[in-house]
Design a protein with these regions (language model features):
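Perimembrane helix-loop-helix junctions
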Residues: 171-186
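Transmembrane-helix motifs of polytopic, lipid-linked glycan transferases
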Residues: 69-90, 128
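Transmembrane-helix signature of polytopic, membrane-embedded enzymes
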Residues: 82-105, 123-124, 143-148
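Start-transfer (signal-anchor) and selected internal transmembrane alpha helices
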Residues: 1-8
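Membrane-interface transmembrane helices that cradle and orient dolichyl/undecaprenyl
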Residues: 129-150
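Extracytoplasmic catalytic/substrate-binding loops of multi-pass membrane glycan-assembly enzymes
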Residues: 12-25, 34-50, 58-62
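Membrane-interface alpha helices of multi-pass inner-membrane proteins
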Residues: 150-165, 176-177
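Multi-pass, polyprenyl lipid-linked donor-dependent membrane glycosyltransferases
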Residues: 19-23, 66-73, 101-133, 160-171
Length: 186
């Protein structure tokens, strides 16, 4: 549902939006500027890969749009997962509907989803991590331990958080410590 609401924004912003920081990274990827360690290497590889894909299909713009579309699909999946967690926690319908409407229509979500920026996948990776923390703490039995799905989702969130922003470790490590200490006390 959220992805459908974002389609007009994706169409208007085709192929993508970039701020000046991302533009300089893109220029580095294209060889127009010298390479810098200022930008996340993972984002550079994603941009390079999707741009090459676009060129192979006949349009570099299609490659940039492929990146933005993949980002939007990931974000919509995480938002959908957060709705599922809220439902399992018996959150009131009005709260779930309000949070879904906020994600679908608030300018910050609609605009950010069309921007190539390291903060977008980082933010949704953090939301995924928070959903897993809540699910593990409040919805799972201690005797079940960590499921394969939990490990997969936490690994994905850790990978994106640690590779997209230098401060990802300052968030990830204390939260994991709290998770493991919290499960021991249950």
């Amino acid at each position: 549902a959220v992805l459908l609401c974002w389609l007009p924004h994706l169409a208007v912003s085709y192929p993508a939006s970039m701020n000046s920081d991302t533009q300089s990274q893109f220029d580095q990827i294209l060889g127009l500027l010298p390479w810098s360690k200022h930008h996340p290497t993972l984002l550079a590889f994603f941009l390079l890969g999707t741009t090459r894909l676009g060129h192979a299909l006949g349009s570099g713009n299609a490659g940039l749009f492929a990146y933005v579309l993949a980002q939007a699909v990931f974000a919509a999946a995480v938002i959908g997962y957060s709705q599922r967690i809220m439902r399992r926690l018996c959150a009131p319908v009005w709260l779930r509907a309000l949070s879904l409407a906020l994600c679908a229509f608030a300018p910050v979500y609609c605009d950010n989803i069309t921007v190539i920026l390291k903060d977008v996948p980082y933010s949704y990776a953090m939301l995924l991590m928070l959903c897993e923390m809540v699910r593990q703490r409040f919805l799972e039995k201690e005797s079940e331990g960590f499921s394969a799905g939990f490990v997969l989702r936490m690994t994905l969130s850790a990978f994106l958080m640690l590779r997209m922003r230098p401060n990802g470790a300052m968030v990830w490590i204390p939260i994991c410590a709290a998770l493991f200490l919290g499960t021991r006390g249950r």
